[in-house]
Amino acid sequence: MSATAPETTKSSTLALTVGAIGVVFGDIGTSPIYTMREAFSDRYGLVVSLDNVLGVLSLIFWALMLVVTLKYIIFMMRADNRGEGGMMALLSLVLRATRRGSRQRYLLLSLGLFGAALFYGDGMITPAISVLSAVEGLEIATPALQPFVIPLTIVVVVLLFMLQRRGTAAVGALFGPVTLVWFAVLALLGLLNIVQNAAVLAAINPLYAVAFFADNKFAGFLALGAVVLAITGTEGIYTDMGHFGKKPIRVAWSLVVLPSLALNYFGQGALILRDPQALSHPFYYMAPEWALLPLVGLATAATVIASQAVISGTYSLTRQAIQLGYCPRLDIFHTSESEIGQIYMPWINWTLMLAVIGLVIGFGSSSNLASAYGVAVTGMMTIDTILAFFVITTLWKWTKWLAVPLLIIFLFIDVSFFSANVHKLLHGGWFPILIGVVLFTLFATWRRGRGLLMKRLAPGAIGIQPFIESITQHPPTRVPGTAVFLTAATEGVPHALLHNLNHNKVLHERVVLLTVQNEDIPHVDDSERLEVEQLAPDFHRVIAHYGFKDEPDVPSALELARQHGLEFSMMETSFFLSRQTLVPKMGREMSLWREKVFAIMARNASSATGYFKIPANRVVELGTRIEL
């Protein structure tokens, strides 16, 4: 037993490492297709010279080292919430570390929520620029195919999104190996060109980056807007930490991804110095002519895999936002019986698809799309730094002498990248910012609206003890079976119970008041799932606890109630739900237009029946009209 355990550990680490290469690093792994080309595009005015090429290469190399390796691989992955990472995990840590109602809590939550909203803008641009840049390789192989680049890109995008409902379980096992081959090809192409001009390796010296700024001044600073393309996808390293673990991600980055990326970028630099005409598409010109079409095919596969990771990440982020109370319920379908994280959300899927197609048609080329790329990414990077600094100093009590220098270094880098991308706002960068602002408004409106709704319901609530005393003194007619009343409040009598009693004049033999409560941790163990309190004979309050990455399942939770002495038979249990009809009204607590938006969101939210996996034939819905 002891002899085989290490082998099992090694094999599982290897499998997770290969998986991480496919999912975590797909986005950053496809950046070499367009990054060097953009750095020397006309918009930055850089001429191809030895100093400029070495300067750009040095900036890219040290961006990979400082931002990806030092900040995310080493630092950010320490700021985890019980092993989980990402903006929502950071937000939940902020909730835990701040006092309810404080101004500090409000500002940090608003900042984190805006960072999460920016992810959606990034999630729209990534599939568009990735797939389009790959298919553009056809122009190099066969110029006659140039008119078909946009249509072929749209076909690939449509197929990608249409396959989402079937899930990625069948082909997911190929993601890691295919991306591993991709990184091997990146390294090989880079090496083949480096050996023809090894002088480019001098760019490892950061003094070339410093000299680049000194020589090019403001134009050199603006070129950071292209350099940042080399580190897009870094948020995925932090977000997917819970899926693969810290060690596999760090091993994959250190042994495979970083060396392959560095070699490829240096190889492109060597090619440009040897043949400046290759600047129109240095990535594809690195390959021999006979390998162009296979390379286009492999690049398309790699960009589809990178896009899949972003799409799955968008689903996951949305589900977490729902759990944390920032988003209305949406339909969620599971596409795998074994992997709980593999989900499909139709509304998100088709919205993303339309946005991606619109971007492909509207911008027309990956070069034009690159002008819109970077603003959202650098915004998220900056917000990550601020929230992580707050968490490690407040929650984990890191000493200021260690935390402050790190904050200064990371913020200086993040703000520099963000500032260099601000000029892109007029050239398409407004799009992800607009998406972020709209979604931030919707998230904040939903959160505020739910709080306002609970406030409106509170004055009409009846205390549980007076209610029990009333039905004890004047017992209503009791009918066989169990009634479960879902309620968001953990105090008072649910409106659905009062409506049922007023209209039907009966009460079931057993009554359960059930509240589903979402916690600021990723997962809650089954042993801690339920709180059961007996309020009176055959009258109980049950609180079911779920983490923000858990899947609420009321029937399964009630099965656990047996451990607390409560037996449930689904065929003898009725579930009573309240459905509110919201009426916007001019008030001081929320503007009328936001109340109208909240009412629309509530009206279009998916049914609690399906979301909580309650059998539809056991549900009774009772309506309530509420003025906001």
Model-derived segments and their meaning:
Residues 1-628:
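The structured alpha-helical core of multi-pass membrane proteins
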